[in-house]
């Protein structure tokens, strides 16, 4: 393991104001420099997490995201600029590029992949804290089960419209996500960024609380954790701190050790993407894609462009973005059956 190396002067100069803060001091700053944090999702929340932790001097940031930058992201996803959207850079890559400009002395490890049962445990390996930057409960349950299994602290967060929520999970010390939310909200029962939109202030607020909790965990200030479910509505000026009690002994995850989200899935999966008229198709077994060969095969059927990270194919009203691991985002439909049909027709089974 390579540990970032800093002189006393460099540390004191860059982080001088942070070191003055009583909760950090020099000892806390050195703990931050030696820490590794996993950020799952690098959209609105995740990019805010990444920038704050990078500037704070967390020594190693592992950033995972399955998507690429689009113009509609720029309103609230602070790590990205117009040229990232024009180039259709993967969010993890664009964030890593920006972070290296912000702080060249920390280690950035970007992963362009879909987080699932097959890779989550490898991704959290060696990490001190996991930060939630996702937009769906299935991935959060995955994070929860993996973190509970490996006793890794993680910080849940969500934001939609002007409302946000966050909670810190310390396995077997606090309730886990399944203790509080036994099941995901039924489809169409709760607002999403598709239906309610989202404003940037709630993103900043939720991320600020999540990052602050992370700093407390990394520096050992665990008695200062808020130990609650924090809820905010910045438009309605509402702030609530809901007691979460103690872990549920009958919880499938932290009580009974039944990590359902980590069980293998033998078939192709499809997921509706928040905020877009799009479906993600993931093959049951990731396969390396030769973009040049695929482009030659697809050109007679439509417009094809590719770079080292992804291939974009337009045909009629549809657009398929194919990643190196054979995942594809099918845009122009909200019907899973249609997306699967297009994937099978143009990419293969």
Question: Where is each model-derived feature located?
Answer:
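Adenine nucleotide-associated cytosolic modules
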Residues: 2-349
């Amino acid at each position: 393991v390579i540990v970032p190396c800093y002189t006393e002067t460099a540390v004191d100069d860059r982080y001088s104001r942070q070191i003055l803060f009583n909760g950090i001091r020099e000892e806390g700053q050195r703990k931050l420099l030696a820490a590794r944090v996993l950020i799952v999702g690098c959209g609105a929340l995740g990019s805010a997490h990444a920038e704050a932790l990078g500037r704070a001097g967390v020594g190693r940031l592992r950033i995972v995201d399955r998507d690429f930058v689009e113009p509609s992201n720029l309103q609230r996803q602070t790590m990205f600029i117009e040229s990232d959207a024009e180039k259709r850079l993967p969010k993890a890559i664009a964030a890593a590029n920006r972070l290296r400009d912000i702080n060249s002395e920390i280690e950035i490890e970007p992963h362009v992949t879909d987080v699932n049962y097959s890779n989550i445990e490898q991704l959290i390996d060696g990490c001190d804290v996991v930060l939630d930057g996702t937009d769906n409960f299935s991935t959060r349950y995955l994070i929860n089960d993996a973190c509970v299994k490996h006793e890794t602290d993680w910080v849940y967060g969500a934001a939609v419209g002007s409302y946000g929520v966050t909670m810190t999970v310390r396995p077997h010390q606090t309730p886990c996500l399944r203790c509080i939310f036994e099941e995901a909200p039924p489809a169409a029962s709760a607002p999403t960024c598709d239906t309610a939109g989202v404003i940037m202030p709630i993103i900043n607020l939720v991320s600020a609380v999540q990052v602050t909790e992370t700093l407390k965990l990394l520096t050992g200030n665990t008695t200062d954790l808020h130990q609650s479910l924090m809820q905010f509505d910045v438009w309605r000026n509402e702030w609530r701190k809901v007691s979460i009690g103690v872990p549920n002994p009958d919880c499938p995850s932290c009580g009974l050790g039944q990590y359902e989200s980590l069980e293998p899935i033998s078939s192709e999966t499809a997921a509706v993407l928040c905020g877009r008229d799009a479906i993600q198709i993931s093959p049951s077994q990731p396969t390396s894609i030769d973009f040049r060969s695929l482009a030659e095969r697809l050109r007679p059927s439509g417009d094809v462009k590719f770079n080292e990270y992804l291939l974009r194919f337009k045909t009629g009203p549809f657009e398929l973005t194919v990643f190196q691991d054979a995942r594809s985002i099918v845009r122009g439909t909200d019907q899973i059956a249609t997306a699967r049909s297009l994937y099978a027709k143009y990419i293969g089974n």
